[in-house]
Amino acid sequence: MRLPVLVVSVLAAALSLGACDQAGTSSTAMDGSLAAADGGIVSAAPRTVDPGSAHDNLNAVLWVQTSAEYRALSLQSFRAAADHLARALEEPNWDALVPSERANAGTGLQPAVIMDIDETVLDNSPYQARLVRSGEHYDEVSWAGWVAEKKAAALPGVVDFARAASIKGVTIIYISNRAQHLDEATIANLKAVGMPVKDADVFLGLGTHVEGCEQHGSEKNCRRQRIGRDYRVLMQFGDQLGDFVQVLSNTAEGRAALLEEYGDWFGERWWMLPNPTYGSWEPAAFNNDWGLPPEARRQAKRAALDVAP
């Protein structure tokens, strides 16, 4: 299947770094939750190491914070999405929800765009940078403290896109794996960077109850279904595959199959932002077993590398 050039460039840029998540944490740590192998939510314990030793996330965080390439990819994504917005509004059957997540017809509903927050709207790389410098790793206490600071900046291009969509009558919906109790600080941060926030109901954090749908772990499918009851979803933005569709099998093969099935949606209805610092792509390399020692996980990731023998 031919993928849009934009998609290929974003995926290539993110994956080529080869930088993994903070050792000893989950791939979804920055969303405020940890996905266990069985799909449940577990807590991360802080782990202190020698600050002078190599940190798994150093190159990835440095790239996000300093490279022109990262900024260019972000600008490119949001500008390209803006170019598709008029067409999405004009076509009454345009829908960015997969069929299994829409129980009702979207035609005639008010338009909306669904956005993940962390590393899609807000840049949390300063929090990551602190962990790299200190030699520590994600934990819920330090993460909640960072959220409370409300210092996350907006990704390049996102505010311009969101404001343009809002002017056209499109509601911006935020589906995030930040815990629901972090809503006030999160909404304040969104408003501070200039993002449109219609009301408190547009933030659907982890733990949001959706009647008639049982949420598994940190999956977002139930919350997407809830939005689909009231809105015609024109586009979705995220930095993880699970921001767009439910990932039932978090293996390299399972993830590749989803991309094969929905590849044509990227660059049109779905817009992926680069995030080399963490993601569910990492535990897919070691069978989602966060109980393995850090070095065992690194060995599994090395074994997954393609060296073109």
Labelled PLM ranges:
Residues Q110-A112, V121-P156, D160-R163, I167:
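Active-site neighborhood of HAD-like aspartate-dependent phosphohydrolases
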Residues Q76, A80, G145, A153, ...:
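Extracytoplasmic/secreted proteins, especially bacterial periplasmic and envelope-associated proteins
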Residues C20-M115, N287-P309:
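Non-catalytic pre-domain segments flanking phosphatase-related domains
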Residues A29-G32, D183-P309:
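C-terminal cap/substrate-recognition subdomain and adjoining C-terminal extension
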Residues L62-S74, A144-K151, I173-R178, V210-E214:
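Second-shell loop/turn segments in exported
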Residues M1-P4:
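Positively charged n-region of N-terminal signal peptides that target proteins for export
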Residues V7-G18:
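Bacterial N-terminal signal peptides
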Residues E119, V158-L190, V202-G205, D239-L241:
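Substrate-recognition element of Asp-dependent hydrolases with the DxDx(T/V) motif
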